[in-house]
């Protein structure tokens, strides 16, 4: 059995390598050149001693459909989640900062971000990119060299009830930081090499108010005005038969921000045609008064426009699928290449989609940045925490895999 397992790992490793070599609209280096080019780069040793640069910036913080309305896919990789070689991702961290639990909350995330910045000074840097409607900071956590020539963004929890992606992304970034510190490898290469070439940005919880609503109900919201908005949204949806569930269940299924706007319908990508009949705030589906009407969508748009990302990865739930396309996609080939690389790693189905108003759609149409949406889990949102071990195993090495892609294109 051990020999067979080794053969399976080698087969998957070869599959990933072939996809990473394919490239998108440019000619990719062969794997031997990729590895030698990465090896030739001086391993990232962190910035010069600068207390200000190392200090975390932590402020006070006080049932599901797939994102693009496509059918859930089927895992096609029987070895999904099994890593290709004796990499750092096959090891278990000792004394980890991040300990995933059901309903992993905003306050837990903030505490863990602060602890990671303290444990890995110079490797993990933190900044707030804005505040939510209810006053919570929205954090961008950078792993690696912030001034690297290549940059990749991982964004999660734009939809409130999909909060299972938050501990996933927090563990992903911790593994990158720990791998650098402990001389970890992936695909036979030191993680420090890629961390010198690529800055990994993580926004694990873009919609902290919404996540708090889905986990705690309206009592988690500080603003009385926002609580009244939520109550009015329920009354309007109840009157129009958009919902028949109790108020408590309505809160649990909440997808929007605290102002009742679906943030993934709040971007200028065929926005005018979205849900024209829904004109009031709601737990889901309301696009807002205009694109980027919300502080959370403004925060992520400003980060993207001001940083120059080479790729953006959006984590959602549910379906075990990867979406890569949109209308008028300016980065179709590159986006499809990213999707194929993730599929080779975890076996999620690769699907095209023609979504409107979403962050991925805006990235590909207007911003000219390759992007994909990865939908994790199979149960109705909020996805059962019993699925988390499988989700982690399938996605733990996604950042390293896509980091290699970005580094070589």
Q: Locations of the language-model features?
A:
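Bacterial N-terminal signal peptides
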Residues: 24-37
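Metallocarboxypeptidase
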Residues: 267-409
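Short glycine- and acidic-rich boundary segments immediately preceding or forming the N-terminal edge
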Residues: 40, 54-134
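Loop/turn elements at helix/coil->beta-strand transitions in domains of secreted/extracellular proteins
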Residues: 121-125, 134-138, 148-151, 196-201, ...
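Short beta-strand-to-loop junctions in surface cap/lid or active-site-entrance loops
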Residues: 140-148, 157
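Active-site/substrate-binding loop(s) of hydrolase catalytic cores
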Residues: 164, 171-173, 177-323
